[in-house]
């Protein structure tokens, strides 16, 4: 049995995606990486902002996710920071996601990258873009919740 198999450690979180999109569904996918990439991920040198997923020839690919070059490896053994990376999903999941992405206005975005045991996993979300007024509604809702919480906290003190 693999040690630490159930332990999950979040390495990178894409909070901007949750701000810019309505997340309809989420999927977990493995990522095909090189040795220097997994070492950089373990060091926490990942940026998911601006990343996206595309289905090409029945395979899911992760684009524009920046994994910094590993410091200790030489210049010949290092990787390209923003290269496309293949995602590991079941064939059924890929075909289902592809059907949903073909609908107008939907896209796939990486939400978080984490380590489960020794494996790197990425949580991708089927997302629909938010309009400016949707973002303003969310901000107003958060502000209202914050003022209510403040009032309740103040009331509990007295």
From Swiss-Prot:
NCBIfam families attached to this UniProt entry: PRK05422.1, smpB
Pfam families xrefs: SmpB
Family to which this protein belongs: Belongs to the SmpB family.
Entry annotated with the keyword Iron-sulfur: no
InterPro entries the UniProt entry points to: SmpB, SsrA-bd_prot, SsrA-bd_prot_CS
CDD domains in alphabetical order: SmpB
Organism name: Roseiflexus castenholzii (strain DSM 13941 / HLO8)
GO cellular component annotations of the record: cytosol
Name the record gives this protein: SsrA-binding protein
Molecular-function GO terms, alphabetical: RNA binding
UniProt-listed GO biological process terms: trans-translation
Keywords linked to the UniProt accession: Cytoplasm, RNA-binding
Localization terms from the record: Cytoplasm
Keyword Protease on entry: no
Function: Required for rescue of stalled ribosomes mediated by trans-translation. Binds to transfer-messenger RNA (tmRNA), required for stable association of tmRNA with ribosomes. tmRNA and SmpB together mimic tRNA shape, replacing the anticodon stem-loop with SmpB. tmRNA is encoded by the ssrA gene; the 2 termini fold to resemble tRNA(Ala) and it encodes a 'tag peptide', a short internal open reading frame. During trans-translation Ala-aminoacylated tmRNA acts like a tRNA, entering the A-site of stalled ribosomes, displacing the stalled mRNA.
The organism's place on the tree of life at top rank: Bacteria
Gene designation per UniProt: smpB
PANTHER family: SSRA-BINDING PROTEIN, TMRNA-BINDING COMPONENT OF TRANS-TRANSLATION TAGGING COMPLEX
């Amino acid at each position: 049995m693999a040690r630490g198999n159930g332990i999950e450690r979040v390495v990178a979180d894409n909070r901007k995606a949750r701000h810019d999109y309505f997340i309809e569904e989420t999927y977990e996918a493995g990522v095909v990486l090189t040795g220097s990439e997994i070492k950089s991920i373990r060091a926490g040198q990942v940026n998911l902002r601006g990343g996206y997923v595309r289905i090409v020839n029945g395979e899911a690919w992760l684009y524009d996710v920046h994994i910094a070059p590993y410091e200790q490896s030489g210049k010949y053994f290092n990787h390209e920071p923003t290269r496309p990376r293949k995602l590991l999903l079941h064939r059924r999941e890929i075909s289902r996601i592809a059907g949903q992405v073909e609908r107008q206005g939907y896209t796939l975005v990486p939400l978080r990258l984490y380590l489960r045991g020794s494996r790197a996993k990425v949580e991708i979300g089927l997302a629909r873009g938010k309009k400016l007024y949707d973002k303003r509604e969310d901000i107003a809702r958060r502000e209202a919740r914050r003022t209510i919480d403040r009032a309740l906290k103040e009331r509990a003190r007295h």
